[in-house]
Amino acid sequence: MNTEPSSAGPEPASLQRIALSLQYDGSSFCGWQRQRNGRSVQAVLEDAIAQLDPHRPVQTFAAGRTDAGVHAAGQVVHFDCSGPIPARKWAPALNGRLPSTIRVRESVARPLDWHACYSATYRRYRYTIHNGRRPNLFLSPWSWHCYQHRLDESRMRDALSSMLGLHDFSAFMKAGSRRAHARTTVQEVLVERQGDLLRVEIQASGFLYGMVRLLMAQLVAVGEHRLSVAAFEQRWRERRRHEVKEAAPAAGLCLLRAGYAKPIFTKAGWYDSQPWFFLAESDPPTDPPSTPG
């Protein structure tokens, strides 16, 4: 990616920094980050920005680098531009050039020293599990259909709560991470059931590569009584990465939002105001009797 300033571009004083609140369906992309082989959210977004500001090389920065198949309801992205478009007009202008799988909810101006990634104080992810006996076509793109039996959300809540605070989470870091260490602060956790849907939310100062999907597979083992709460805690505290062998599917994971010292957007994320629990119904205790005739 060319990051050198264009000699034909405007003076730096004319730059404005734009922050976007972004949603996307991760199943359509190979992840956030631009890649040589594959369609990334970053590449598609940068191409759309370039159409509106063709005189300056485009480079975007995101609060979280979601992996292939992972969704976002409140991704935060920034870029610098030199054109005459007012900050608030970038959202509708980009939506007219982006595929339907990416939507910009809001666009605002930010100071040039503000950064979507480095200024963030937390990121919050949600993982959704469909814990019903029968698969649901409308939920499958957004959740993990997981049913051996009803998951014990109380045990899952106890296990997840053990992670609160600043710790080394090497056990939940995929190989290939560029981080110098595996320490991060888990600030809040939530495990909540409504009908056949379980939502698990984790808020942290930052997340390791593959962290949420690795720990979710372990958490489901706790909910299925295949792994004790104590064993779950022992695995991550003692950094037993070799015992964490599976990752939960990407479809259930969504970057809910990123937070900053002061709110920068006026509209709440879609997941905050309109959770889609209504899409699933609880399984009945038994199948209804067949009707004669």
Swiss-Prot record:
Keywords for the protein's UniProt record, in alphabetical order: Isomerase, tRNA processing
Its biological purpose: Formation of pseudouridine at positions 38, 39 and 40 in the anticodon stem and loop of transfer RNAs.
Keyword Isomerase attributed: yes
Segments traversing the membrane: none
Binding site for substrate: 125
EC number annotated for this UniProt entry: 5.4.99.12
Catalytic reaction(s) noted: uridine(38/39/40) in tRNA = pseudouridine(38/39/40) in tRNA
Family to which the UniProt record says this protein belongs: Belongs to the tRNA pseudouridine synthase TruA family.
GO BP field: tRNA pseudouridine synthesis
Protein name in UniProt: tRNA pseudouridine synthase A
One GO MF term attached to the UniProt entry: tRNA pseudouridine(38-40) synthase activity
Active-site residues, Swiss-Prot/TrEMBL: 67 (nucleophile)
Tree of life domain: Bacteria
Species of origin: Synechococcus sp. (strain CC9605)
